[in-house]
Amino acid sequence: VQRLQNAGVLTPDSLLAHCTYVDDVGLDIIRRSGSSIVNCPESDLFNSTGCCPVFKILEKGITLGIGSDSYAADMLEVAKMSLSELRHTAGLPNAGFPEVARILFDGNAKIASRTFGIPIGRIQKGAAADIIIMDYIPYTPLSAVNTDRHIIFGMSGHECVMTMAAGRVLMRNRRLTFAREDILSRKTTAAAEDLWQSVNQDAQNRLLHYE
């Protein structure tokens, strides 16, 4: 973190991902810079790279969001993993839920609003029309008091039937509106094979060089 500060890259527009090894000194630097942190719990746990110090970050008043470095695409599953991570690190079976809800609903909206220069994360005049519709059937009482718990515990991405971004419907009835998924699949599969071949060839060339 000190190196980033010395290089002049820590600004209110900076996003610091993971931060599993950051200490109190580093967090104080981040707080003073106005930078934000994004926790990526599924990737961190999968790669055994440690856990983001969520409680310390929030205590210091640093803006914290939750996301993924492409390991996961379902943010509700990421939120569930974040909750498990927090309870494990705290050693308390009842800890973490208020923090996860705050990160998911408030932290992400604050970061996105600042990044894109428009209110995000609310339904009101002048805000970005970013809306999803979930086909969710609650099996316990659902009210304004426990909506966040139903979202995090009860829902998952496969229940999303409509996605709208900036007023444009991108998915309707679980089908993309702007592209054909079969064509995308063929293109991404071919691109992945080309990438793998290129990486393998580069690795072989390096081995030959060192031999």
Where are these regions (language model features)?
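His/Asp/Glu-enriched, well-ordered alpha-helical/loop segment
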Residues: 6-9, 13, 53-138, 154-155
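Active-site glycine- and acidic-residue-rich loops that bind
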Residues: 45-48, 114-116
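Short, acidic/turn-prone active-site loops that include or flank metal/cofactor-
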Residues: 41-46, 69-71
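Conserved, mostly hydrophobic/aromatic
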Residues: 16, 30, 37, 79, ...
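Conserved strand-to-helix beginnings and helix N-cap segments that scaffold or border functional pockets
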Residues: 27, 50-51, 76, 145, ...
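Short, electropositive alpha-helical surface patch
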Residues: 30-40, 190-194, 198
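Histidine/acidic residue-rich metal-binding segments in metalloenzymes
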Residues: 1-36, 47-64
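Active-site microenvironment of metallo-dependent hydrolases
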Residues: 105-211
